[in-house]
Amino acid sequence: MLTMEPSFSAPGAIPPRRTPFLVYRDRIGAPSELAFLRRQYIGFTQLDPVWIGRVLLPQAPAVGARLLRLGGEGPLGALHRFLFRHCGIVPPIPVDGLAPVVHAQFARGGALALPLARALNAQLVVTLHGGDVGKEKNWSGTVLSRRWPAVIAATRHFVCVSNAVAEVAARRGVPAAKLTVLPIGVEVPDQPPPPLANPTYHLFVGRFVEKKGIAVIVDAVRRLRAEGDSTPVVFVGDGPLRPLLEALAKDVPGIELAGWLPPGAVKARMAGAWSLLVPSVIAANGDAEGLPSVIPEAMAQGCAAIGSAEGGIAEAIRHDVTGLLVPPGDAPALAGAMRRVGDPVVRNRLGLAGFRGAAADLNAGRQSAKLEALLLGG
């Protein structure tokens, strides 16, 4: 148990200083991670996250104000990072008064952060997101596979974003007593957005990779176009399957590849969409979803989500209540669900119920406060 003084302040007073603690993410600033990583800490009142990793990408400041590149930027920085990665030798950490806890993002992050936690005599907490524990290539000849038994032994809590992720972690040997299921919350407006009179498109947000069901969407869209349905589909993101979508855009009208957009622009796209498409599948390499953060994000904007009936997606979407579920990999079923939300009565009913569900169960402030309690020793 970490001992810290409770924080109280009178109205108008300067907020008390929070205690810094380290959050480890090896590559900080991947566009697909910015929103859900930041939201984990927005309700903290006693701890102040200091992000640390070996690589700081250009968009890293979007996750938090305090960023450290492991080893620094000086002439010895590359050597420090090499020794840390391969030998577990921890360079000096230029932060005073750190709380004795390290929060690592993703399973591999836990493996890399293990020597850091040991060097600081700090407790280790690891958040697992899905593919990080499910993808088979992560478990052969990697730093994760080599250090995993030690990570299990040293970690106080494995925080899982869904029950499905917790089940995979248990199969990887994590004791049930160390598993905590805590979905990442979402910032929900005080009032549900008013239904749009004429939303004009379906929406996908995420990386263009196999597990996101890109091929399923392509098949479904081709079926809809063959039936005369010309509703546009907007793809926000990027990735290795972009050529598949570029080919679709050449063949059929109404396909927009918007690239990565800032969080505010993504919210606006969600608020104006017929539906959010999340037809994820288990990839050939074992990569699978945990709980895609775009689902609660869409619900908070009153946007109906259409997702695969498996894993964390099926936990987040109540079929025909807060969204629609379809069998994984079933393009005809996805096309049917996309047609169904064309009915404004159905679309608005699902959108309102999704908003209420997100507000009740996935409020970012409450979920974040629960995480802080775990880090403090709860």
Report residues per predicted region.
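N-terminal subdomain of nucleotide-sugar transferases
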Residues: 1-68
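Acidic donor-binding loop of glycosyltransferase active sites
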Residues: 271-287, 303
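Nucleotide-activated donor-binding/catalytic signature segment of Leloir-type glycosyltransferases, i.e.
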Residues: 243-267, 275
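Conserved acidic donor-binding segment of nucleotide-sugar-dependent glycosyltransferases
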Residues: 316-320, 324-331, 338-345
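Carbohydrate-associated surface elements
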Residues: 164, 185
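Short hydrophobic beta-strand element within catalytic cores of glycosyltransferases
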Residues: 295, 300, 304-307, 317
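Short His-centered aromatic/hydrophobic patch
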Residues: 104-109, 128
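Conserved donor-binding/catalytic core segment of Leloir-type glycosyltransferases
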Residues: 22, 193-225, 234, 276
